[in-house]
Amino acid sequence: MSSLMVLSRRAMVLGALSVPSLAYAQSGFDSWVASFKSRAHSRGISQRIIDAAFANVRYNAEVVERDRNQAEFRREIWDYLDLVVSESRVTNGRRAFRDNRRLLAEIEDRFGVPAAIVCAVWGMESAYGARRGDIPVIEALATLAYDGRRGRFFEQQLMAALRILEAGHVRSRNFVGSWAGAMGHTQFIPTSFEAYAVDFRGDGRRDIWSDDPTDALASTAAYLARFNWRRGMPWGVEVRLPSDFNFAQAGRDTTLMPSEWARQGVVGVDGRAVPDYGSAGILLPAGARGVALMTFANFRTIERYNASEAYVIGVGHLADRTAGGGPFVASWPRGDRGLSSAEAAELQRRLNAAGYNAGAVDGRPGPQTRAALRAWQSSVGLPADGRPTLHMLERLR
């Protein structure tokens, strides 16, 4: 294919900026960098490290564009899981697990975090090391700190990144990561690296960047252990709900022991009571018609790694599949999507008009809107799961 027919994403981003505006951004960036370098030196970073770190650093317009557009379109849970727990990823995960079995076992023995969970985080974050990022960390963080949308946060990360270089954990030429400055096999941000990364190889460096994943995988386990991973407790278990289940009890804030849930008819998909691993809630990621999960305290621990509920389910399910488990037994309601902001606002208006207090019409269904929806669902004989979907909106119209 002719090079004239190929237009890279970077070229498109740069092309969207006029030459004067890009030059203006670069000029402002250069001034900001000069000021930051002075601050870094005053905080104890050597001039040698500062000069090496910022050599050839430029304002990266693509990083800014990705930061401003990171609010992705809404993806249904089943579409997300199809992507992150695909059959190819499961196959690759089982291979990575086998190839690193001894290392993962040693890490599990040290930190108490299951090998399959650590391997699943690796798969989710970098496809088992295949996609660790290739953007210079200093350039990405400096650009984002200068841009200002979350300037204070990224300036903190940039200062931490310089300390990492100063400590000799990585050379400047190998100091690459994602557009947001996340680094290595399991995508640590610099401040998390400083606080939680470990030198599992014992060579004096915490090296999460090289092809050897040892320190990265151990660091992930250390992180989860620090946030109270409980040995012998699963992240969650797929369950079967009784036909008369009270959906007002669904949600992670209502917790009971599995034996108590069993007395209400909530059992594993094999029909047996779930063992009493600890207090658990019932999570319905797609409402009454989809997969039901009994989630434990370790669910919240994984959430400390990434606060997305879908991400936690992805890690947990990928770990289960990696360890030899099968897909979820229940099916997803693939024909019933969630709502756009405009549709959610319409749902709120219609609930309010029908006498159910859905709160402010803001297109963001929160607890009040969901409670109003549950009340309406109960009044018309529908499972009161409170999930705002297109089907529910159509019923209200």
Question: Can you name each region flagged by the protein language model?
Answer:
Residues Q47-Y277, G290-L293, T301-A319, A323-S341, ...:
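Catalytic glycan-binding domains that act on GlcNAc-containing polysaccharides
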Residues S2-L17:
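N-terminal secretory signal peptides and thylakoid transit peptides that target proteins
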Residues A23-A25:
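Boundary at the C-terminal end of the N-terminal hydrophobic targeting segment
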Residues F29-Q47, D51:
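Mature N-terminal segment immediately following signal peptide/propeptide cleavage
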Residues L339-A344, N352-L396:
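Short acidic, glycine/serine/threonine-rich helix-capping segments at coil-helix boundaries
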Residues S279-L293, S341-L351:
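Short glycine/proline-rich, acidic loop/turn segments that cap or connect secondary-structure elements
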